Curated annotation (Swiss-Prot):
Name of this chain's protein: UDP-N-acetylglucosamine 1-carboxyvinyltransferase 2
Species of origin: Mesorhizobium japonicum (strain LMG 29417 / CECT 9101 / MAFF 303099)
One Gene Ontology term from the biological process aspect of the record: UDP-N-acetylgalactosamine biosynthetic process
Record-listed E.C. numbers: 2.5.1.7
2-(S-cysteinyl)pyruvic acid O-phosphothioketal sites (modified residues): C116
Signal peptide: none
This protein's UniProt keywords: Cell cycle, Cell division, Cell shape, Cell wall biogenesis/degradation, Cytoplasm, Peptidoglycan synthesis, Pyruvate, Transferase
Length: 418
């Protein structure tokens, strides 16, 4: 099992190429199952979650032709098989194949999902959306069993909260429904809008994605398509914090300011400078870090996927910061590991009080999930001495060559193979 060895104290400088968004790629790979025609996805990140999702569509008979940062998915011979727990236990996003399989074949059997251990994250809203479209749903022996032998029917779906996964599930299923579907209280994330753009390229007629109200025409006439995945705003935010925490300057190539307004606003409140460059965003810090409070919110609010990274940053700021997590329960699993490095953090329910300014020191730490693991990397970059981070397979799920990208910008980091 690989580990990372990091010696702190180096200022990061240079340029980082931001990869395609993992959280946009996964539903688009699943969406390929909707159509019998090939879908080519470009700007595809080279991360294990993407490889696992490609494996899931292969399981259902898709032929995948892979090249550097691209894949062509041909599902002309696809079938709806049972997606077993052994297949899906590695990541929660595999539940996204449920809607495409049901919509195209009229039946689907998908195991209840696994993934990061950061709370229950139930699929109730996914199931409710499919039921609203006319599907019959049952949970049997850990499987979601869905059927719609006479097809799906367009309807109005009101989500109880703006869930990204439920919005994507409803949107994909509605593309083949008879008549129009309206989704209200839809998630507004850029990844949702990018899925709609991909589906429209494939032949769907979707309007309003990126707002709280999405309209899907239904009865889609599919055709072959090509789609370029948006840059990863979470990866961009992570490297922005890396520049900030080390007092460096990084150019984030391909990063889009319009997807990162809440992140940029909070970084600027801590004394970090962010401005657009010719190829993306430039992030720089020359002044001492100031403490700032944070509340995670659905987009366009501050993303929960950057909460752990921002906590690492606040460990280095003068003063106290209060971080409130409102999206997922149990998403402070990184706190004990940050404290092993010397951080002063107190937890109370869904809040964390960070008293910054303490000197961090290298230690052996363990990654517990994807975003928690990268917060440990950020803290290690400014810790005195050597830090060893175990279980870095969590990092590889969502960050493409993170150690290489950091090393090219001046970090003292190496991957140790077991």
């Amino acid at each position: 099992m690989d580990r990372l060895r990091i010696v702190g104290g180096r200022r990061l400088e240079g340029a980082v190429t931001i990869s395609g968004a993992k959280n946009a790629a996964l539903p688009q790979i699943a969406a390929a199952l909707l159509s019998p025609y090939p879908l080519e996805l470009t700007n595809l990140p080279d991360v294990t979650d993407v490889e696992n999702m490609l494996g899931v569509v292969r399981l259902h008979g898709a032929e995948v032709t892979r090249s550097a940062h691209a894949a062509t998915i041909d599902t002309s011979a696809a079938v709806s098989k049972e997606t077993s727990y052994d297949t899906v236990r590695k990541m929660r996003a595999t539940v996204l194949v449920l809607a495409p399989l049901l919509a195209r074949f009229g039946h689907a059997r998908v195991s209840l999902p696994g993934g990061c251990a950061i709370g229950a994250r139930p699929v109730d809203m996914h199931v409710a959306a499919l039921a609203a479209l006319g599907a019959k749903i049952a949970i049997e022996n850990g499987l979601i069993v869905a059927s719609a032998p006479n097809g799906l029917t367009g309807t109005r779906i009101v989500l109880s909260s703006p869930s990204v996964g439920a919005t994507e599930t409803a949107m994909m299923a509605a593309t083949t429904a008879k008549g129009e579907t309206e989704i209200l209280n839809a998630a507004r994330e850029p990844e949702v809008a990018d899925l709609a753009a991909c589906l429209n390229a494939m032949g769907a007629r979707i309007e309003g994605a990126g707002t709280h109200r999405i309209l899907i025409a239904g009865d889609t006439g599919w055709h072959a398509a090509r789609h370029d995945i948006i840059p990863d705003r979470i990866e961009a935010g992570t490297y922005a914090i890396a520049a900030a925490i080390t007092g460096g300057q990084l150019e984030l190539t391909h990063a889009r300011l319009e997807h990162m307004a809440s992140v940029v606003q909070l970084l600027e409140a801590t004394g970090v400078s962010v401005w657009p460059g010719d190829r993306g965003l430039i992030v720089s810090r020359e002044r001492p870090l100031k403490a700032a409070d944070l509340t995670t919110e659905p987009y366009p609010g501050f993303p929960t996927d950057l909460q752990a990274q921002f906590m690492a940053l606040m460990c280095c700021a003068e003063g106290a910061s209060l971080l409130r997590e409102t999206i997922f329960e149990n998403r402070f699993m990184h706190v004990p590991e940050l404290m092993r490095l010397g951080a002063n953090i107190k937890l109370q329910g869904t809040m964390a009080l960070v008293r910054g300014g303490e000197k961090l020191h290298g230690a052996q730490v363990m990654a517990t999930d994807l975003r928690a693991s990268v917060s440990l990397v950020l803290a290690a970059l400014v810790s005195e001495g050597e830090t060893i981070i175990n279980r870095v397979y969590h990092l590889d799920r969502g960050y493409e060559q993170l150690d290489r990208k950091l090393r090219l910008c001046g970090a003292d980091i190496e991957r140790l193979s077991a």
